[in-house]
């Protein structure tokens, strides 16, 4: 690895190292064999919890061991203890899981087991779990597992309190994006929150006004992002999600009460802005692709067929995309086929 000095080992040192590794492999294989035999026998005795701990200390990504651990708790441990004892046991289990999360913050099976513990705990502490998500995302703001887990925790708090945290969570994603625009997980979370916030508004007129306000705020934020870093794919994907709502068949809360004429105006404004960026960044494939897609969508909304000049301009943009991004040539050729079919 870079920055690490390689030390040349003598023959004797190599043999000693190989012997140690061989011993570790044999130990691990022995544990796996014991686990497989015990589970095959459906041996759910509490003593096998230690076996699962040893295996998970070796490799926390072994989902079948996590499953067996839960089977032991459900079949042998829980039936024998009181609610308070069960809570104490699961508190210790959560501490164990947290120790794994700190070292392996992106292993699905660890998060899955934590959720199971909380769902089986008599008195789950969701506020503490929210603090855990903040620490996870503070360490890595783009950790998809951390964002997914946060959505889960928020849903549990909302259900317990019969309330909505959507607006607060929107503020949280805004802070995360302000720190780093290139945060696809935060932007993805935003797509879910926007529709939730709009659905909270019961009055149709108020919902329409709020939809326009949110759309314009989101576009302003994205404009700043694309001009700051035009090659950031996460920002363009989010922009496409926003503008995709202008599709004539879109009935999502964000755009459903905005007229076709207003959708056309939004598209035209975005096209002008992207053309301006394209002049500064002529090799940017995101600009090229967005111009083709949005101009074609605009024609559809206007119920007009593209002119020969339109087709020629879009074809030149597709050719540019293939040139600057040849690895995705198949995708761009499919786009070209769609362009060719627009006049048929």
From Swiss-Prot:
Q: Name one GO cellular component term.
A: Rab-protein geranylgeranyltransferase complex
Q: Which Pfam families match?
A: PPTA
Biological process terms from the Gene Ontology for this record are: endoplasmic reticulum to Golgi vesicle-mediated transport; protein geranylgeranylation; protein localization to plasma membrane
Q: Assembly state and interactors?
A: Heterodimer of an alpha and a beta subunit.
UniProt catalytic activity: geranylgeranyl diphosphate + L-cysteinyl-[protein] = S-geranylgeranyl-L-cysteinyl-[protein] + diphosphate
Transferase: is it a keyword of this entry?
yes
What's the protein called, per UniProt?
Geranylgeranyl transferase type-2 subunit alpha
Question: What is the role of this chain?
Answer: Catalyzes the transfer of a geranyl-geranyl moiety from geranyl-geranyl pyrophosphate to proteins having the C-terminal-XCC or -XCXC, where both cysteines may become modified.
- Which taxonomic lineage does the organism of this UniProt entry have? Eukaryota, Fungi, Dikarya, Ascomycota, Taphrinomycotina
Record EC number: 2.5.1.60
């Amino acid at each position: 690895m870079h920055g690490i000095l390689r030390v040349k080992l003598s023959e004797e040192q190599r043999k000693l190292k190989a012997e140690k590794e061989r011993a570790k492999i044999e130990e691990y294989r022995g544990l796996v064999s014991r686990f497989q035999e015990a589970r095959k026998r459906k041996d759910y005795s509490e003593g096998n919890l230690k076996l699962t701990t040893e295996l998970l200390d070796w490799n926390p990504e072994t989902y079948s061991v996590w499953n067996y651990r839960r089977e032991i708790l459900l079949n042998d441990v829980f039936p024998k203890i009181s609610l308070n004892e069960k809570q104490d046991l699961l508190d210790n289990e959560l501490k164990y899981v947290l120790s794994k999360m700190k070292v392996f913050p992106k292993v699905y099976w660890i998060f899955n087991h934590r959720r199971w513990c909380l769902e089986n705990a008599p008195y789950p502490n969701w506020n503490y779990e929210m603090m855990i998500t903040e620490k996870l995302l503070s360490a890595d703001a783009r950790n998809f597992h951390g964002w997914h887990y946060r959505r889960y925790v928020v849903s549990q708090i909302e259900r317990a309190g019969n309330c909505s945290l959507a607006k607060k969570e929107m503020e949280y994603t805004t802070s995360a994006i302000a720190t780093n625009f290139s945060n696809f997980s935060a932007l993805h979370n935003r797509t879910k929150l926007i529709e939730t916030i709009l659905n909270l508004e019961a009055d149709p007129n108020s919902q329409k006004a709020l939809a326009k306000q949110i759309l314009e705020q989101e576009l302003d934020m994205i404009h700043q992002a694309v001009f700051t870093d035009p090659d950031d794919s996460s920002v363009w994907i989010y922009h496409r999600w926003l503008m995709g709502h202008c599709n004539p068949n879109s009935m999502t809360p964000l755009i459903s009460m905005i007229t076709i004429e207003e959708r056309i105006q939004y598209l035209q404004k975005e096209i002008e802005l992207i053309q301006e960026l394209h002049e500064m960044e002529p090799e940017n494939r995101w600009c090229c692709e967005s111009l083709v897609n949005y101009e074609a969508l605009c024609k559809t909304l206007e119920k007009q067929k593209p002119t020969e000049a339109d087709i020629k301009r879009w074809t030149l943009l597709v050719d540019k995309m293939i040139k600057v991004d040849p690895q995705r040539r198949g995708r761009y050729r499919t786009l070209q086929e769609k362009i060719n079919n627009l006049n048929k």
